[in-house]
Regions:
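Active-site-adjacent structural segments surrounding the nucleophilic cysteine of cysteine proteases
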Residues: 1-118, 239-245
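Conserved active-site-adjacent core of cysteine acyl-enzyme catalytic domains
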Residues: 5-8, 90-244
Length: 245
């Protein structure tokens, strides 16, 4: 067969490809670039902490005693979904680890996050501030008018924190006023994403249609999702490492 010059692939790999193989790569170039940008990882590498005391009481994987932490008249299990998502991203991509409670304490230290009995959940601005101090390239977005734009963003991202509500669409999430979840590992062949849902131990760590997520984005919120596209160890001001809870 006719050979083409050495071609650089993702992860710094070089190889020589024949014409047919090269054509396959050209056809799937966008998919390969997205995989390279994410970095090589699969479901087994993804952290997916649970927030609730019921999961902890049942001894569920990914649950922890942070669910019973009491903060200003509110239990972590009632408001900790966003912090679980942030801890998931930090522990999956930084080479370090933290618990959701560690993330709570750090967010209180370095951002304007001030939980109250009425509102305990972390807001978008504080989430972005904390993730950037953790070394991540993080940006906030509003829901695009077309699904394809959202899909392309998710495809190329390392991970996404999304805010969903059953008031916008209840195909998947039921009786949910507002809830943060993580999505990652977009699958081109099925148009699905890997879901880390802090409030659903049975639905946690499953693939679901990305369209469900798009339709359920909470549109009354100022923002609907936070995209994480990169990580820099040098920019990580925290370097927390270890999960004690």
């Amino acid at each position: 067969p006719e050979y083409v010059p050495a071609v650089r692939l993702y992860a710094g790999i070089f190889t020589k490809l024949d014409g047919e193989e090269y054509a396959v790569i050209e056809k799937n170039k966008d998919i390969l670039v997205a995989a390279a940008n994410r970095g090589y990882f699969d479901e087994s590498d993804v952290y997916s902490f649970l927030q609730g005391p019921k999961s902890w009481g049942e001894g569920r994987a990914w649950s922890g005693e942070w669910s019973n932490q009491y903060v200003r008249g509110n239990y972590f299990g009632n408001f900790g979904c966003g912090l679980c998502c942030m801890a998931n991203i930090y522990s999956t991509f930084s080479g370090h680890t933290c618990s959701p409670w560690d993330m709570f304490l750090y967010a209180r230290e370095v951002s304007g996050y001030t939980p109250t009995k009425k509102i305990g959940a972390i807001g978008w601005g504080d989430m972005k501030t904390v993730m950037r101090k953790c070394g991540f390239d993080a940006e906030l977005y509003t829901k695009p008018q077309d699904y394809e734009t959202f899909r392309d963003q998710v495809r190329s991202a390392k991970s996404v924190v999304v805010l969903v509500s059953s008031h916008d669409d209840n195909t998947y999430w039921k009786k949910t006023g507002g809830h943060y979840v993580n999505i990652s590992l977009y699958k081109e062949d099925t148009d699905e994403v890997f879901l880390a849902d802090p409030a659903d131990p049975d639905g946690n760590r499953n693939y679901i249609p990305l369209r469900y997520v798009y339709d359920a984005l909470k549109t009354v919120s100022k923002y609907q999702y936070l995209l994480v596209n990169g990580y820099s160890e040098e920019q990580n001001q925290w370097k927390q490492d270890g999960i004690d809870e």
